[in-house]
Regions:
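A glycine-rich phosphate-binding loop feature that marks nucleotide/adenosyl-phosphate handling sites
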Residues: 170-171
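Conserved beta-strand positions that form and line the central face of beta-propeller blades
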Residues: 7-8, 17, 30, 60-63, ...
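Intrinsically disordered, low-complexity polar regions and short flexible loop motifs
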Residues: 130
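C-terminal cap/loop subdomain of S1 sulfatases and analogous C-terminal strand-loop tails that border
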Residues: 38-41, 46-123, 127, 145, ...
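Active-site rim elements
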Residues: 4, 24-34, 47-52, 84-87, ...
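Short acidic-hydrophobic sequence patches enriched in Asp/Glu that either
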Residues: 7-13, 33-36, 53, 57, ...
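Histidine-centered active-site microenvironments of extracellular/periplasmic hydrolases
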Residues: 1-29, 36
Length: 172
């Protein structure tokens, strides 16, 4: 079965984040912006009025907490590298509605990864029509333009986060 937060599934990647700071945030404030765990330290530094180190990849989302009309990240990037046949290594991006995942299925010399490779594959989910991610629509014609667009964004996100270990393959 699945355990941990290893797979790029909504049940794993969606996490509540609760913060109490009455001086700045009204009680009951809710925000549905896309965030990544690397943004949390940047937020805490922002509230502590400490300059974010240049090498820190995360961004403070303080302004998003105060104004839900502001737009945050268009995508979140995810990478799982500890490959095994039942939990293949993969990376992907998620927008507010869609998710594109590539299972590259190779251990890439990682110490704790299983050496047995798995066939590479793609998955694409429309989280509005399929919130439980039960129907992979990667091969459906009506989604192809969006998949091509998200594929280009996946390449950009990997580069931005300096994840160069395995390239994003062409869509197949």
């Amino acid at each position: 079965g699945f355990f941990d937060k290893r797979m790029m599934l909504e049940q794993s990647s969606r996490m509540p984040f609760v913060i109490r700071y009455p001086k700045d945030l009204p009680q009951g404030t809710r925000n549905e912006s896309l965030l990544m765990n690397i943004d949390i330290p940047a937020l805490l530094l922002d509230y502590a009025q400490v300059k974010r180190p240049e090498q820190m990849q995360g961004e403070s989302f303080r302004s998003l907490l105060k104004d839900d009309k502001l737009e945050g990240r268009p995508y979140t990037y995810y990478r799982y590298w500890e490959h095994s046949p039942d939990r293949p290594a993969h990376f992907g991006i998620r927008s507010s509605r869609y998710k594109l995942i590539h299972y590259y299925g190779k251990p890439l010399g990682m110490k704790s990864a299983n050496a047995q490779a798995t066939p590479p594959s793609w998955e694409f989910y429309d989280l509005e029509t399929d919130p439980n991610e039960l129907k992979n629509v990667f091969n459906e014609p009506s989604y192809q333009d969006l998949i091509v667009e998200m594929h280009a964004s996946l390449i950009n996100e990997k580069a931005f986060y300096e994840d160069h270990q395995t390239p994003v393959p062409d869509l197949e």
